[in-house]
Amino acid sequence: MSRDPTGVGARWAIMIVSLGVTASSFLFINGVAFLIPRLENARGTPLSHAGLLASMPSWGLVVTMFAWGYLLDHVGERMVMAVGSALTAAAAYAAASVHSLLWIGVFLFLGGMAAGGCNSAGGRLVSGWFPPQQRGLAMGIRQTAQPLGIASGALVIPELAERGVHAGLMFPAVVCTLAAVASVLGIVDPPRKSRTKASEQELASPYRGSSILWRIHAASALLMMPQTVTVTFMLVWLINHHGWSVAQAGVLVTISQLLGALGRVAVGRWSDHVGSRMRPVRLIAAAAAATLFLLAAVDNEGSRYDVLLMIAISVIAVLDNGLEATAITEYAGPYWSGRALGIQNTTQRLMAAAGPPLFGSLITTAAYPTAWALCGVFPLAAVPLVPVRLLPPGLETRARRQSVRRHRWWQAVRCHAWPNGPRRPGPPGQPRRVRQGGTAITPPT
């Protein structure tokens, strides 16, 4: 690819390559969860131990995310994505070549350390190539990488694992190898001023004197728990709790992740339209909490709605990531966005690493409904933390226009005679005629 892609088609081509490379890293990070049925059946591995093994890539991510972000700010996206994908592939091949679960866990941990740079680099790459009015949509498409990576793992790994754990691990190894080659051939860093030409204000830390980024980090970390829990345990829940076959459960998980991918594109476009990344995040958090509480209420009751609710939360739980990543790159700027995304992904991965073993133990000792109810507390706690007043640079006018529309609608539906009272029955905005004495009468029909 040309080293100076200025056309619209070239920008979208870079975004597609970035999507594929990031999807390969998420395939490795989340794919181990689809080995759990094989580990339980063939090796008798307890669910808590299998959950710990599935979390090892996330623990590796936690260790290196900030370091990858620092490197990203200094060497650029292409180098980080190529090197990270190659090292992840090497770790996956190593994990597939050993028999001991201990050594498999070690290599999964090392692979997680290597995979840490792809997500941050891919997000910053897309943010750098697209203008504000297209950034939410472009980032939403790029953020389909996670559900697409998980969907491919759910479709392929359980079937390969029927031949053994090692066969299942070879799939992410091959895909990450292809991603490393694609990074070298298809990624071009967006044009930026060198750090030596940047002003002191541009190089200043966005964390100084502001809690905006910390609030986004905290909210996104809390919203990561439903995503982690559903990805890790949906397959085994369908197999053990509902008696589904491995193939049937894998197909449903795949469909759920594909719906989540489409949802990410939709909410990205939504954020461009309303001129805000954070208002949709707050609504997503509230919807995730409500869905998990409903799932906890109907699970074990023999209801036919529990599977539908599981699909719903699997979709809702993945919707917010692209919005948060976009807001961070816009707020932090080109010289701090790598480190800010590194911190963001570190907080998310701490939750992702802690979730499988903790909830695996809870499911074993209590039951699935208890786990769903506790999981619902996390997105509920995120609701007040979301900084909804944060406006994307370049979209402030659009956001204010939306606010004016909402204000006018509210003025229309309020009671004109008593502004602080409830709205009178009837169509919104219906005026009330007032007699000379001040008594309101019903308008003619």
From Swiss-Prot:
Mode of membrane association: Multi-pass membrane protein
Cross-referenced SUPFAM superfamilies: MFS general substrate transporter
Transmembrane segments: 16-36, 52-72, 98-118, 168-188, 219-239, 243-263, 283-303, 366-386
One Pfam family linked to the record: MFS_1
Keyword field contains Methyltransferase: no
Keywords from the named record: Cell membrane, Membrane, Transmembrane, Transmembrane helix, Transport
Gene Ontology terms: cellular component: extracellular region; plasma membrane
Chain spans, region Disordered: 417-445
Keyword Membrane: yes
Compartments, record wording: Cell membrane
Similarity comment: family membership: Belongs to the major facilitator superfamily.
Name listed for the protein in its UniProt record: Uncharacterized MFS-type transporter Rv2994
Gene source species: Mycobacterium tuberculosis (strain ATCC 25618 / H37Rv)
